[in-house]
């Protein structure tokens, strides 16, 4: 019966492998099945720790609330309660907006919510449920240095992070009498950038793994 659900599964191959492993385990056979482990909103967890944000920490399991929290569902439900069922947003879409916005993205939230009332409800909700973590987003934008070729920092284990600032140069070239635009990435200062938040968070993630 379970195998009949494979076409409906979000990840059909993983679902199929899991069912096979389940059947073999029930027969007492060694399965050697590699399980998948994932953190609970690891980006939000790290931001909560960096900022000492108790509200955000309770949202994603950093502070034990007595049961397993699902930050994405909590934020989604907060939005639905605020704007009503007419919002026509899904948890999965909301999750995409939350994940990317915590790394500085504004494009994905706009794709999900548009640029009107729904987007503002999203911003207000994030500010309410994870105030310090959300504010750190703006800090990462504000500390962008428009004069440097790289951003550098040192982690507690003396790992030196060096991230080049990359921009693009567009040039027109002729090839067989046809004009083409060639885009080249170069190491050059940029007036604005959104990568600091993601890079700092990921560097701390790597530090914890080491």
In which residue ranges do the predicted regions lie?
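Conserved catalytic core of nucleotide polymerization and phosphodiester-bond processing enzymes
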Residues: 1-210
């Amino acid at each position: 019966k379970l195998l009949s659900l494979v076409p409906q599964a979000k990840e059909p191959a993983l679902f199929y492998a899991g069912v096979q492993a389940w059947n073999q385990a029930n027969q007492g056979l060694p399965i050697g099945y590699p399980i998948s482990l994932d953190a609970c909103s690891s980006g939000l967890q790290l931001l909560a720790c960096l900022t000492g944000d108790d509200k955000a920490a309770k949202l994603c399991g950093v502070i034990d609330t007595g049961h397993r929290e699902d930050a994405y569902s909590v934020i989604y439900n907060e939005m639905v309660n605020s704007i009503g069922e007419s919002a026509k947003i899904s948890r999965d879409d909301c999750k995409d907006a939350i994940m990317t916005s915590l790394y500085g993205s504004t494009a994905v939230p706009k794709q999900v919510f548009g640029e009107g009332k729904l987007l503002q409800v999203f911003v207000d909700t994030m500010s309410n449920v994870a105030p310090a973590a959300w504010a750190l987003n703006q800090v990462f934008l504000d500390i962008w240095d428009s004069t440097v070729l790289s951003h550098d920092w040192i982690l507690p284990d003396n790992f030196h992070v060096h991230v080049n600032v990359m921009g693009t140069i567009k040039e027109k070239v002729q090839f067989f009498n046809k004009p083409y635009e060639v885009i080249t990435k170069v190491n050059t200062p940029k007036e604005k950038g959104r990568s600091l938040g993601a890079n700092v968070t990921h560097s701390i993630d790597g530090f914890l793994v080491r």
